[in-house]
Amino acid sequence: MINKTLNFTGLIFIILLFLYTSINYNSLPEKVPVHFDLYSNPDAWGYKKEIFILPIIILALWIFMYLLFKYYVKFENFKSTFENKTISKDAINFNRRFITILNFELSTLLSFMGIKDVYNATGGNIDIGIFQFVIILVVIFSTIILHLYKCYKHKYF
């Protein structure tokens, strides 16, 4: 149940990003920042149509991660036929949960980043500087490290 909730919630954030970007599209200037340095200062500008690149990338990433979640069992079964070993059902569920959590974190964090970019392009001012980069790295890598630790602890390798 938690997997479905997290997957659905991540998709909702992406849809909200598309809606927010579409609603504010007409109020965007012709040139908008499309790339930022480490401190969130714009270092590349593009046409306002390019503001949809980030939501499209986030949606493609979400679809890829969701398909990986959905077909993980088939992938594991295919892999185990070549390695002559089976993976436990607990390990499969644990890894599927990890994929779901990572998908949720990525879609949520990147959607908020996209909303911030649109808001700033329309004249707003949300400046969290390097903390945006740090937050994303800490959340993603702490999830990965925690997953690897639990895999090692439960001998899921």
Roles of regions detected by a PLM:
Residues 104-123:
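Alpha-helical transmembrane segments and their membrane-interface junctions
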Residues 12-13, 46-65, 132-140:
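Alpha-helical transmembrane segments
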Residues 24-27, 62-81, 147-154:
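Membrane-water interface of transmembrane alpha-helices
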Residues 21-52:
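Active-site and channel-lining beta-strand-loop segments
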Residues 127-157:
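Terminal transmembrane helical module of multi-pass membrane proteins
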Residues 6-7, 66-68, 95-108:
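Select subsegments of transmembrane alpha-helices in polytopic membrane proteins
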Residues 1-14, 51-55, 96:
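Alpha-helical transmembrane segments and their helix-start/interface "positive-inside/aromatic belt" motifs
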Residues 81-95:
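Short membrane-interface loop/juxtamembrane segments of multi-pass integral membrane proteins
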